[in-house]
C-alpha cells in the first residue's frame, strides 16, 4: 500500500541532519546509514550513501532518477547463488 500524499516522505532525522551538514560544507563524504526505509529526496542527489545490507554497508551514489524510491531498493540483502544442480547419481 502506498503512502498517503497528505503525508511527507519518510526520511530518518539523523540522515537528514548529516545531508544538511554536508550541503553546507560542500564536501563529498560517504554517509553511513542503517535506515533502509528512508525515501530519497532531491537534496540527497549527488551524495554517496552507504546502506546497510544486514552484513555490510554498500555505497550507492544517488542520482536524480532515484528520487522517490526507498534506500533499501538499491542495496540487496540476499545473494542468489543459483539453483541446485541436478545430480542423477543420487536419485533412485
UniProtKB/Swiss-Prot annotation:
Q: Which InterPro entries match?
A: Ribosomal_uS19, Ribosomal_uS19_bac-type, Ribosomal_uS19_CS, Ribosomal_uS19_SF
The record ties this protein, via Pfam families, to: Ribosomal_S19
Q: Which GO terms describe its molecular function?
A: rRNA binding; structural constituent of ribosome
GO terms under biological process: ribosomal small subunit assembly; translation
| Keywords on record | Plastid, Ribonucleoprotein, Ribosomal protein, RNA-binding, rRNA-binding
Known role: Protein S19 forms a complex with S13 that binds strongly to the 16S ribosomal RNA.
Similarity-based family: Belongs to the universal ribosomal protein uS19 family.
Q: Which NCBIfam families match?
A: rpsS_bact
Q: Under what name is this protein listed?
A: Small ribosomal subunit protein uS19c
Q: What gene, per UniProt, encodes this protein? A: rps19
Amino acid at each position: 500500500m502506498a503512502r498517503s500524499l497528505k503525508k511527507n516522505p519518510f526520511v530518518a532525522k539523523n540522515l537528514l541532519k548529516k545531508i544538511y551538514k554536508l550541503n553546507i560544507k560542500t564536501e563529498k563524504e560517504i554517509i553511513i546509514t542503517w535506515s533502509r526505509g528512508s525515501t530519497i529526496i532531491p537534496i540527497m542527489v549527488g551524495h554517496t550513501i552507504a546502506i546497510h545490507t544486514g552484513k555490510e554497508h554498500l555505497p550507492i551514489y544517488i542520482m536524480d532518477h532515484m528520487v522517490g524510491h526507498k534506500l533499501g531498493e538499491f542495496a540487496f540483502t540476499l545473494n542468489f547463488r543459483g539453483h541446485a544442480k541436478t545430480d542423477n547419481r543420487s536419485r533412485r
